[in-house]
């Protein structure tokens, strides 16, 4: 089985077999599987957060660009924003029990699966093109620099 292509930026991996939700500084990856989308935190979010200690996830209906939960790390507490509208049909209990699995491997550690309401969920805030990802992450890195 071939490994999915990815981009490496400053030691952080960004697999090209998924999409990235960038609204509200979300740093959420999406992996569509028919009308189900698995989502998780990307490598940048995991790196910036430091050790992730706790996840709180709401169950049930979610709306695009609205918070569906939060996570707490050694550095801050942050909201989790949904890239799509739909219904959370599965929560990854392994991540709730051991949140640091996201620090170890953010792309094998999905947080929730959402059954989407509308397959036409694409927006300017969901990117998948290699050049768009590079531009976005480099911009995010610059935002974190202290002058």
What are these regions (language model features)?
Residues 71, 78-80:
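Short beta-strand His + acidic residue motifs that chelate non-heme Fe in jelly-roll/DSBH
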Residues 83-85:
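Elongated periplasmic alpha-helical coiled-coil
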Residues 1-58, 64, 77-78, 87-147:
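Non-catalytic terminal segments and appended small domains
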């Amino acid at each position: 089985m071939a490994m999915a292509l990815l981009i490496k930026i400053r030691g952080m991996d960004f697999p090209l077999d998924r999409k990235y939700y960038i609204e509200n500084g979300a740093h959420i990856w999406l992996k569509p599987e028919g009308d189900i989308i698995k989502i998780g935190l990307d490598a940048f979010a995991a790196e910036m957060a430091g050790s992730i200690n706790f996840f709180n996830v709401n169950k049930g209906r979610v709306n695009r660009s609205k918070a569906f939960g939060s996570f707490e790390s050694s550095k801050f507490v942050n909201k989790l924003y949904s890239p799509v509208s739909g219904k959370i049909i599965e929560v990854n209990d392994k991540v709730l029990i051991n949140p640091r699995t996201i620090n170890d491997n953010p792309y094998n550690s999905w947080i929730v699966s959402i059954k989407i309401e509308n397959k036409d969920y694409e927006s300017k805030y969901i990117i998948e093109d290699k050049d768009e990802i590079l531009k976005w992450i480099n911009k995010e890195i610059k935002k974190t620099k202290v002058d």
